[in-house]
């Protein structure tokens, strides 16, 4: 989880 990179890896 992380939104550090916009929402490319939308692994909330």
Swiss-Prot record:
GO cellular component, one term: extracellular region
Any GO BP: defense response to bacterium
Record's keyword terms, sorted: Antibiotic, Antimicrobial, Bacteriocin, Secreted
Source superkingdom: Bacteria
Subcellular location, record wording: Secreted
Location (main, coarse): secreted
Subunit structure: Monomer.
Role this protein plays: Has antibacterial activity against Gram-positive and Gram-negative bacteria including Salmonella, B.cereus, B.megaterium, L.casei, L.viridescens, M.flavus, C.glutamicum, C.crenatum, L.mesenteroides, E.faecalis, S.flexneri, S.aureus and B.thuringiensis.
Name of the protein described by the UniProt record: Subpeptin JM4-B
Natural source organism: Bacillus subtilis
């Amino acid at each position: 989880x992380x939104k550090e990179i916009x929402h490319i890896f939308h692994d909330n």
